[in-house]
Each structure stands twice: as structure tokens, then as C-alpha cells.
A protein has these predicted regions:
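Post-HExxH zinc-binding segment in Zn-dependent metallohydrolases
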Residues: 148-149, 156-204
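Bacterial N-terminal signal peptides
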Residues: 7-18
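Acidic/histidine-rich, surface-exposed loop or edge segments in extracytoplasmic proteins
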Residues: 28, 34-66
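Pan-zinc metallopeptidase signature
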Residues: 193-233
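Auxiliary, metal-adjacent structural segments of Zn-dependent hydrolase domains
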Residues: 52-110, 170, 185-187
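Boundary at the C-terminal end of the N-terminal hydrophobic targeting segment
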Residues: 21-23
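Active-site scaffold of zinc-dependent metalloenzymes
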Residues: 94-134, 146
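Second-shell loop/turn segments in exported
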Residues: 61-70, 122-126, 159-167
Length: 233
């Protein structure tokens, strides 16, 4: 039965690659800049100064990170659309990079917390460029998954209902982690996933992320991606 299911999914994936060949090449243009205004206003409001050294360090690494995204970003987004069979619903997204304490990266409003990537503000060794790319991809996938499931009956799916007792953090990452794993595997970018998982363990929601990945592995990533293909139906 499992062999049959995998075969059906494989056929569906091939059809998706063909039918969305045009759409998958149209990926959103993603840009990011250090928001000095955000950092200044935030630090003044919270009474938590940011050193000029840290701000200068962030500005120095931005060009390198842009170059890295230009190399890795488009193929991650194209492969996502190809695997799921649904195009990205927006054409552009702009992120504000910041160092102010008290906020974290999020999909909306589009914010990138850079404290762990800057030597003077990271607690220990700064995170790698691979983790930076993974953070952007992660936040974009939140929007993509939400768009795919927008028409789900009663706002849920079979597997979200099955795991309704789990925390919202776990449920909000099931489909995301499924797509993430298939995309990184398809592109042979497993190091990005490995580094991301290590980085996640340092965060307060780390246990919830671990639990979500356990569920995805148990049910298989293809199971959750199929729900995205069907719009949650």
C-alpha cells in the first residue's frame, strides 16, 4: 500500500512539474536591507542601545548575504512551486533587517533578526550564511503555506485535525517543514537543513520545532505536501 501511495505521489509530482512549468519560473523578488530607522526607534523605545560597532558589522555583511541569496534563493522558490504544484501568490517581498533586542524574525511584518549573524551581538559563533538563507526561506514558506491552505474547509485539514492537540507552533510548522525537507533534498542542500535544525535548538520554540519535524517524518513529508496540492481539501 505504501509503495502504491508513493507511486501516486510521484506521478502527481511529475504532472505538477509539467503543468506549472511556466508558473514555477515566476518567483517573487526578495530583497532585504538594514532598517536603521527601525533599530533607532526600537532601541530608543526599549532603552536598549545598539553599539555603532554592531551596526557597522551588520552593514558590512549585507552585500555578501545578498549575493548568497541571489545564488540560492531563486532555486529554492522555484523548486517549492514545482514540488507543490502551486505558484507563489506575490511578486515581491521586502525584509527589514534589524539588531534591536526584543524582536525576532517573522513573515509578517517581514522582519529579519540579525543578532545571531553579527559577531558582536551573537552569543558565541555567528550563524552561517546557510542558516541566514534558511531563515528567509522559512519565513517565506509561512506565507506560501498559508496561501495554499486559504481555502481549506473550516480552516483546517485532515492532518491538522489529527494533531489538533499539539501546540499552535507545532501545527503551524507541519506543512512548512514538509516542503522544506523535500526542497532541500531535491536540491541536495541538506547542509542547510542540518545547520538550521542545530540553530533551532537554541531558540525558545526549539522543542516545538523538534516535535513538528518528528510528526512530518512519521507521516512523511509527501503526506503534508499533498494537502497543499489540494488546497487543504
Amino acid at each position: 500500500m505504501k509503495i502504491i501511495y508513493v507511486s501516486v505521489f510521484s506521478i502527481w509530482l511529475v504532472l505538477g512539474l509539467v503543468l506549472t512549468a511556466g508558473a514555477q519560473n515566476k518567483v517573487p523578488n526578495i530583497t532585504f536591507n538594514h532598517s536603521n530607522v527601525f533599530d533607532r526607534t526600537c532601541s530608543d523605545t526599549l532603552k536598549k542601545p545598539i553599539s555603532p560597532e554592531s551596526l557597522a558589522e551588520l552593514d558590512r555583511i549585507v552585500p555578501r548575504l545578498r549575493t548568497r541569496w541571489e545564488t540560492d534563493g531563486p532555486k529554492l522558490l522555484k523548486t517549492t512551486a514545482a514540488i507543490v504544484g502551486r505558484p507563489w501568490a506575490f511578486s515581491e517581498w521586502k525584509y527589514a533587517m534589524f539588531l534591536c533586542d526584543g524582536f525576532h524574525s517573522m513573515s509578517f511584518p517581514p522582519l529579519l533578526d540579525m543578532k545571531t549573524f553579527v559577531p558582536s551581538t551573537s552569543k558565541g559563533e555567528p550563524e552561517s550564511d546557510e542558516v541566514f538563507i534558511a531563515v528567509i526561506f522559512h519565513e517565506l514558506l509561512h506565507i506560501y503555506v498559508d496561501d495554499c491552505l486559504e481555502g481549506a474547509p473550516n480552516g483546517t485539514t485532515k492532518f491538522l485535525e489529527k494533531y489538533k492537540a499539539e501546540s499552535s507552533t507545532v501545527k503551524n510548522h507541519l506543512h512548512l517543514f514538509a516542503v522544506e525537507k523535500l526542497v532541500y533534498t531535491k536540491l541536495r542542500m541538506e547542509k542547510y537543513l542540518k545547520d538550521t535544525i542545530i540553530s533551532e535548538k537554541k531558540l525558545s520554540p526549539g522543542p516545538s520545532f523538534t516535535r513538528a519535524r518528528e510528526i512530518v517524518d512519521l507521516e512523511t513529508p509527501e503526506t503534508f505536501v499533498r494537502e497543499l496540492m489540494l488546497g487543504g481539501k
